[in-house]
Amino acid sequence: MSSKHIAAVVMALAIGSVAPASAQTPADDSARRAAELAAERDKKAEELAPSKPSLVERALHWYDSNGAKLQWRAFRFAMGGFTGGAGLGYGVAIAEQGMGSPVVDPDQPNRIDGEFLAARTIRGYQRIAAKMHVLNLGGLPVDVSVRWQDDQLMQEDFYGFGPGSTEAGRSNYRLDSSEYGADFTWRPASPFTIGGELSYLTPLIGEGTDTRYPTTQSIYDVEDVPGLSDLPSFVRTGASLAFDWRDSDSHPRRGGYYRVAAAQTSGVNDASYDFRRLDIAAQQIVPLGNRYRRLNLQAAAALTDSSGVNDVPFFYQPSLGGLRTLRGFSESRFRDRHAAWARAEYQWEAWWALDAAFFVDAGQVASRLSEFTLHDVEVTYGVGFRMHANERVVAGLDIAVSREGVVPILGFRYGF
């Protein structure tokens, strides 16, 4: 085949291969491009569309929006606010805000709020309480309230006094008490509050109902445990000063809280149990880069003092142990005239509704201030998990370790 024939064949093949491409018009290119852009827009819209909240998310949102109250009209479920050793509580509360007013206004002068509670626990503890508040008295930043509370605490623990008390000394007693009181709170400036109280108390000690342990009366002498019998009624007067700049009192992520309170408790027609008490507490939240990681630092001390030969009733003496102080020990594990404790927690948001924490607690009790020594400091440590809504903690599980073993503490932040 000649070179001319070869050139003709190559040219024909080239023209044939180009012909289909040249057959695509500009209109076809525009339509194809428009379809591709539409598909990309649909895909992006699907990615940006909000996901449907889960059942847990909807429940926690409801918990936040409804003030953490299982409520129907003025009635709501309540757990009673008992101490950690009381067991699971259940009951009903009636709360009415702005009584006689069609609108609940937090700034309304002389606004009247009322509350009533009746609760019980699975261990037989009982509580009945009523409160009446008058807010913004006379249009001033002053609140006053009157209250009444009747308690039957059936299985309170007592291990003896001092840091040397042992688990073998565990006993239980019953504390029945009625309290009538009046309080006032003055808010001179936004973070500051100044408070005062006047209370009348009628405590009565009996034998505990926890059959797992002996009663306090059966293994301790009345002479060695002040207040175990022959108690008078008491009058308590007190004053407090607090500074609170936390962003939330139930689930703080930044800020601090500092409080000092002093009280005088005097027996009615019997001065043998008169005493004074000073309480100091501080909390500081330190954000670590953002609101999802933080340090929660706390410290507190409770100091009592009596004149002459007077004794402080044992059940009014400060104690350590349980969820609020030393989590690696049982409730009220250590008791004496003075107590101090501190805590550090590293908290982070493991999930939007779940915080996790590593913590260390340390504390000590002593009969005299001079007896506070590092040698007697008790230390516990562990890990905790707290289910929460945006502003409120719902429940928590802390697993704490101490020299007496591992203590799991399940707590619900709910109630009156």
Regions found by a protein language model. Give the residues of each.
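Outer-membrane beta-barrel translocator domains and adjoining extracellular loop/strand segments
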Residues: 127-132, 156-164, 206-215, 252-254, ...
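Extracytoplasmic gating/loop element in the C-terminal half of outer-membrane beta-barrel translocons
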Residues: 287-362, 367
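Residues on the lipid-exposed face of transmembrane beta-strands in outer-membrane beta-barrel proteins
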Residues: 92-96, 130-134, 182-186, 198, ...
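Transmembrane beta-barrel strands of outer-membrane/channel proteins
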Residues: 77-81, 114-120, 144-154, 159-162, ...
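Sequence/structural signature of outer-membrane beta-barrel proteins
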Residues: 97-101, 119-125, 137, 151-155, ...
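Extracellular loop and loop/strand-boundary signature of outer-membrane beta-barrel proteins
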Residues: 115-118, 165-170, 222-228, 264-270, ...
